[in-house]
A protein has these predicted regions:
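Short, charged, intrinsically disordered terminal tails
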Residues: 1-5
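Compact, glycine-rich, soluble single-domain proteins
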Residues: 7-101
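Acidic/glycine-rich phosphate/pyrophosphate-binding loops and surrounding catalytic core
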Residues: 86-136
Length: 136
Protein backbone atom coordinates (compact mmCIF):
# COMPACT_ATOMS: atom_id res chain seq x y z
CA UNK A 1 0.00 0.00 0.00
CA UNK A 2 1.25 3.48 -0.86
CA UNK A 3 2.32 5.86 1.87
CA UNK A 4 -0.58 8.03 3.04
CA UNK A 5 1.60 10.91 4.19
CA UNK A 6 3.92 13.42 2.59
CA UNK A 7 6.35 16.01 3.89
CA UNK A 8 4.78 19.46 4.24
CA UNK A 9 6.97 22.52 4.59
CA UNK A 10 5.56 26.00 5.06
CA UNK A 11 8.16 28.73 4.91
CA UNK A 12 7.73 32.48 5.34
CA UNK A 13 10.40 35.19 5.20
CA UNK A 14 10.63 35.19 9.01
CA UNK A 15 10.46 31.49 9.92
CA UNK A 16 9.83 27.89 9.04
CA UNK A 17 6.16 27.89 9.99
CA UNK A 18 5.62 24.13 9.68
CA UNK A 19 7.77 21.15 8.77
CA UNK A 20 6.31 17.71 9.25
CA UNK A 21 4.26 14.87 7.85
CA UNK A 22 0.70 15.45 6.69
CA UNK A 23 -2.06 13.28 5.26
CA UNK A 24 -3.75 16.21 3.53
CA UNK A 25 -3.40 19.95 3.12
CA UNK A 26 -6.06 22.33 1.81
CA UNK A 27 -5.48 25.91 0.71
CA UNK A 28 -6.95 28.69 -1.41
CA UNK A 29 -5.40 29.33 -4.82
CA UNK A 30 -6.14 31.96 -7.44
CA UNK A 31 -8.26 29.29 -9.16
CA UNK A 32 -10.16 28.16 -6.04
CA UNK A 33 -9.67 25.70 -3.18
CA UNK A 34 -7.28 22.78 -3.59
CA UNK A 35 -6.76 19.70 -1.44
CA UNK A 36 -3.55 17.70 -1.73
CA UNK A 37 -2.98 14.07 -0.72
CA UNK A 38 0.17 11.95 -0.97
CA UNK A 39 0.95 11.01 -4.57
CA UNK A 40 -0.62 14.16 -6.05
CA UNK A 41 0.45 15.08 -9.56
CA UNK A 42 3.28 17.63 -9.66
CA UNK A 43 1.90 21.15 -9.68
CA UNK A 44 2.91 24.72 -8.87
CA UNK A 45 0.14 27.16 -8.01
CA UNK A 46 -0.24 30.75 -6.80
CA UNK A 47 -1.93 31.12 -3.40
CA UNK A 48 -4.38 33.73 -2.14
CA UNK A 49 -5.16 34.75 1.43
CA UNK A 50 -7.27 32.07 3.04
CA UNK A 51 -7.47 29.37 5.65
CA UNK A 52 -4.86 26.62 5.43
CA UNK A 53 -6.00 23.23 6.74
CA UNK A 54 -3.49 20.53 7.67
CA UNK A 55 -4.67 17.00 8.41
CA UNK A 56 -2.23 14.80 10.30
CA UNK A 57 -2.59 11.34 11.85
CA UNK A 58 -3.16 12.94 15.27
CA UNK A 59 -5.68 15.60 14.21
CA UNK A 60 -6.22 18.76 12.22
CA UNK A 61 -4.66 22.21 12.36
CA UNK A 62 -5.72 25.47 10.74
CA UNK A 63 -3.80 28.65 10.04
CA UNK A 64 -4.22 31.95 8.22
CA UNK A 65 -2.14 31.87 5.04
CA UNK A 66 -1.39 35.14 3.25
CA UNK A 67 -0.25 34.93 -0.35
CA UNK A 68 2.55 32.91 -1.83
CA UNK A 69 2.84 29.83 -3.94
CA UNK A 70 2.90 26.08 -3.48
CA UNK A 71 5.08 23.49 -5.19
CA UNK A 72 3.59 19.99 -5.10
CA UNK A 73 5.42 16.75 -5.86
CA UNK A 74 4.38 13.16 -5.18
CA UNK A 75 6.08 13.08 -1.77
CA UNK A 76 6.48 16.73 -0.73
CA UNK A 77 4.50 19.95 -0.61
CA UNK A 78 6.41 23.20 -0.15
CA UNK A 79 4.51 26.41 0.54
CA UNK A 80 6.40 29.70 0.31
CA UNK A 81 4.13 32.21 2.00
CA UNK A 82 4.25 35.94 2.53
CA UNK A 83 3.09 35.12 6.06
CA UNK A 84 1.28 32.40 7.94
CA UNK A 85 -0.24 32.57 11.43
CA UNK A 86 -1.71 30.11 13.89
CA UNK A 87 -5.03 31.29 15.38
CA UNK A 88 -3.47 32.03 18.78
CA UNK A 89 -0.92 34.35 17.13
CA UNK A 90 -3.59 36.65 15.68
CA UNK A 91 -4.51 39.91 17.38
CA UNK A 92 -8.21 40.08 16.51
CA UNK A 93 -8.48 43.78 17.48
CA UNK A 94 -5.65 44.63 15.09
CA UNK A 95 -7.33 42.55 12.37
CA UNK A 96 -10.64 44.40 12.91
CA UNK A 97 -8.83 47.74 12.62
CA UNK A 98 -7.11 46.61 9.41
CA UNK A 99 -10.49 45.56 8.01
CA UNK A 100 -12.00 48.98 8.76
CA UNK A 101 -9.01 50.79 7.19
CA UNK A 102 -9.23 48.68 4.02
CA UNK A 103 -13.00 49.23 3.76
CA UNK A 104 -12.53 53.00 4.18
CA UNK A 105 -9.87 53.07 1.46
CA UNK A 106 -12.13 51.13 -0.91
CA UNK A 107 -15.14 53.37 -0.18
CA UNK A 108 -13.17 56.57 -0.69
CA UNK A 109 -12.48 55.58 -4.29
CA UNK A 110 -10.03 58.41 -4.83
CA UNK A 111 -7.40 58.34 -7.55
CA UNK A 112 -4.68 57.82 -4.97
CA UNK A 113 -6.30 54.59 -3.72
CA UNK A 114 -4.54 51.44 -4.83
CA UNK A 115 -7.67 49.28 -5.16
CA UNK A 116 -5.83 45.97 -5.57
CA UNK A 117 -3.75 46.63 -2.47
CA UNK A 118 -6.81 47.65 -0.44
CA UNK A 119 -8.71 44.53 -1.58
CA UNK A 120 -5.77 42.34 -0.61
CA UNK A 121 -5.56 44.00 2.81
CA UNK A 122 -9.29 43.38 3.27
CA UNK A 123 -8.93 39.68 2.31
CA UNK A 124 -6.08 39.25 4.79
CA UNK A 125 -8.01 40.96 7.58
CA UNK A 126 -11.13 38.87 6.92
CA UNK A 127 -9.08 35.66 6.95
CA UNK A 128 -7.48 36.62 10.27
CA UNK A 129 -10.85 37.52 11.80
CA UNK A 130 -12.44 34.30 10.54
CA UNK A 131 -9.82 31.93 11.87
CA UNK A 132 -9.21 33.78 15.15
CA UNK A 133 -12.96 33.79 15.80
CA UNK A 134 -13.14 30.01 15.41
CA UNK A 135 -10.63 29.42 18.21
CA UNK A 136 -11.72 31.95 20.84
Amino acid sequence: MADKTFNLQIISPTRVFFDGDAEMVEMKTTEGEIGVLAGHIPLTVILEPGILRIKQADGKKEAALHDGFVKITKSKVTILAESCEWPDEIDINRAEEAKMRAERRLKSGGKSVDVMRAELALKKALTRIDIAGRYK
